[in-house]
Amino acid sequence: NDIALIGEGVRQVYEEVLTPAGLGQVKIFTELGRFMLAPHGILVTKVTHKKKTYRTYLGVDASAVNLMRPAMYGAYHHITNMMNPDGQTEVVDVVGSLCENNDKFAVNRELPQTEIGDLLVIHDTGAHGFSMGYQYNAKLRSAEVLYAEDGSTRLIRRAERPEDYFATLYGFDFDKD
């Protein structure tokens, strides 16, 4: 995924096709969110439930509110168990905390054995985590922390608070006792 190589290929086609057709002034725009930003974000979530029925479910405290892509169209995001990254594996579904049947981060995924309280890292969430997030079922979007090349971190977006849930409503005074 060499962006310079891709750009050169686009430029060649532009000059071979658009310029001779009298369209050399046309501007081309692209959205590079996944390409540029996805690798630079992670979602950290805690395992809150483990249920074994006909399959094993890991319930986590995050949900599609925090990362919509897997629920919306089954997008794959690698998941690491930070408490047991190299342990024996088991096949699990990693499910969010919403009451919707598509609130899943992984289906039939082989992961190192996981226990309640373990922290999972869902990788490559930097592009469309917060921007695709939404307020639903009293779930609020999580904070965003920037992890710099030097290892330092800083808060770049605070977690939503309950008052944010109603911030755009008019005609109600939620501050009254």
Across the structure, where does each feature detected by a protein language model lie?
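Acidic, glycine-rich loop-and-beta core segments that form the ion-binding/anion-interacting portion
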Residues: 1-28
